[in-house]
Amino acid sequence: FSQKINMYTTLKNIIVPLISIPHITVAIGILFLIQPSGWISRIISPWFTGWHNPPNLNIAPDLYGISLIMGLVVKELPFLLLIGFAIITQVNLKRYRQQISSLGYGLISGWFHVIHPMVAQRMRLSVLIVLCFAVSVVDMALILAPSTPAPLAVKIFNWYQSPYIESQFLAASGAVYLLLITIFCCAFWAFCGNVFGFIFRILSFMGCRFLISSFVSKSFLGVLISIAMFFLTLGIFSTVSAGVWAFVTVWQYPDFLPRKWGLSSWELNFEVYIQPLVNTL
């Protein structure tokens, strides 16, 4: 339970820059990583896969929206981790750890019975914010989500852009549907949280401690840390990938790095960027 100051500082230095990266940058970077001609495919080709040309695979965007889910996790996990670390530092973990050990609780059972309720209560608003954004996201869905059919938020955007008046009515009603879906998701999340909280309170009153061996506890903790580090690493490499592609002149498959670097794409399209940049500022 104890948190080392230097470890927290290191993780914070990694997480904060990931939070500041725009969502669309992460989405484009993930697309450049996992698509058939992406960086991951180039790393294992041709020495492992035997591919000398990009394979004909439908990886991203995929039919089930897995790449969109991955992109949302990559972008929102740093925010939730930062909020969680800030909450953990406010809790006297050393004192609670001593009390948990004296009551006979193990690492995992003590976390779920004592620490998790306090952390979950403080993080409820942050989780609901992330949930509302994930349901209504448009920019990442335009890049990573399937288009046949597209998510409701993307369909609303397309209807709003349509010149036909009937599409405007569809966009308005779709926005109401999206609001209702968002409210339902938030209510369902709160309901599940209350149900699990009630179950753990009953188990606590019954004296269930779920004693688990130290090896299993550390293995479970290691799996959770590995999953978090995987998505944090994916976020870092997706940002690097988007930056690399911005300076590419010639990059043939399966070369790991571009053959030529330059600013030709910036120079040729600079006039196209001027007005959007002004509007953004």
Which role does the model predict for each range below?
Residues 17, 95-103, 171, 277:
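Short hydrophobic faces within alpha-helices
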Residues 7-9, 65-67, 80-81, 91-97, ...:
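Amphipathic cytosolic juxtamembrane alpha-helices at the membrane-cytosol interface
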Residues 51, 98-110, 199-214, 254-264:
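Juxtamembrane inter-helical linkers in multi-pass membrane proteins
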Residues 3-7, 89-94, 105-108, 147-149, ...:
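Juxtamembrane helix-boundary/capping and inter-helix hinge elements in multi-pass membrane proteins
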